[in-house]
C-alpha cells in the first residue's frame, strides 16, 4: 500500500537512445530528482541522453493495439471490425484501432469468445532500423529502463532488421 504522506507524481520523460532511437518513459515517482538522476545515468551508459519536452513526442501517436490468436477468428471477419489496420504474424493478428474504437472492438471480440491482449498506448509513426549487430546496446538499454521501479511504460521507435 501507499505510505502515509508520500505523494506520487506521473511524469513523462523523452529521451534518445543509441542509434537515434526515440524513447518515451511513463514514470510514477515519489522523488523526481532521484528518478531523473537514475534515468540519466542509465541512458548515458548506453550512449543515450535525456531530451527536452516535446523532442520525440511528435514521433508517436496514440493507438489501440489488440493481439488475437489466428485460431480464434477467421481473417475475413477482421474486415468487419472498426480497425485501422491489421498485421498477420505467425500465430496471431495484431489489430490497430483509434483510441476511441478500442473499447468497441475489444468488446465485440470478447462477445465472440475471442481472447484478446490489448491496450491503448503510444505507437511510433516511423521506426528506426537497427542492425542485428547494433541491437544488443539498444535491447540492453530497453531492459534496464523496463526494470527500473519508477518506470511504468517504455515506448520506443526501433525495429531490428
Residue ranges: model-predicted function:
Residues 22-28, 124-128:
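Short hinge/gating elements
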Residues 10-18, 50-60, 113-125:
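Flexible hinge/switch segments at interdomain interfaces of large molecular machines
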Residues 3, 43, 47, 113, ...:
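Structural signal for hydrophobic packing residues in well-ordered secondary-structure cores
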Residues 62-161:
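Positively charged, low-complexity, intrinsically disordered RNA-binding extensions
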Residues 4-6, 43-50, 69-76:
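A general structural motif
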Amino acid at each position: 500500500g501507499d505510505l502515509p504522506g508520500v505523494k506520487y507524481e506521473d511524469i513523462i520523460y523523452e529521451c534518445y537512445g543509441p542509434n537515434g532511437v526515440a524513447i518515451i518513459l511513463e514514470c510514477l515517482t515519489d522523488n523526481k530528482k532521484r528518478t531523473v538522476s537514475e534515468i540519466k545515468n542509465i541512458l548515458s551508459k548506453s550512449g543515450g541522453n535525456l531530451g527536452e519536452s516535446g523532442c520525440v513526442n511528435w514521433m508517436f501517436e496514440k493507438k489501440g493495439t489488440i493481439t488475437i490468436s489466428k485460431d480464434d477468428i477467421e481473417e475475413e471477419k477482421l474486415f468487419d471490425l472498426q480497425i485501422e489496420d491489421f498485421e498477420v504474424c505467425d500465430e496471431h493478428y495484431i489489430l490497430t484501432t483509434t483510441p476511441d474504437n478500442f473499447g468497441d472492438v475489444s468488446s465485440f471480440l470478447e462477445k465472440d469468445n475471442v481472447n484478446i491482449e490489448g491496450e491503448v498506448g503510444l505507437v511510433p509513426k516511423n521506426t528506426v532500423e537497427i542492425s542485428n549487430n547494433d541491437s544488443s546496446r539498444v535491447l540492453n538499454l530497453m531492459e534496464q529502463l523496463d526494470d527500473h521501479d519508477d518506470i511504468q511504460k517504455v515506448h520506443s521507435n526501433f525495429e531490428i532488421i
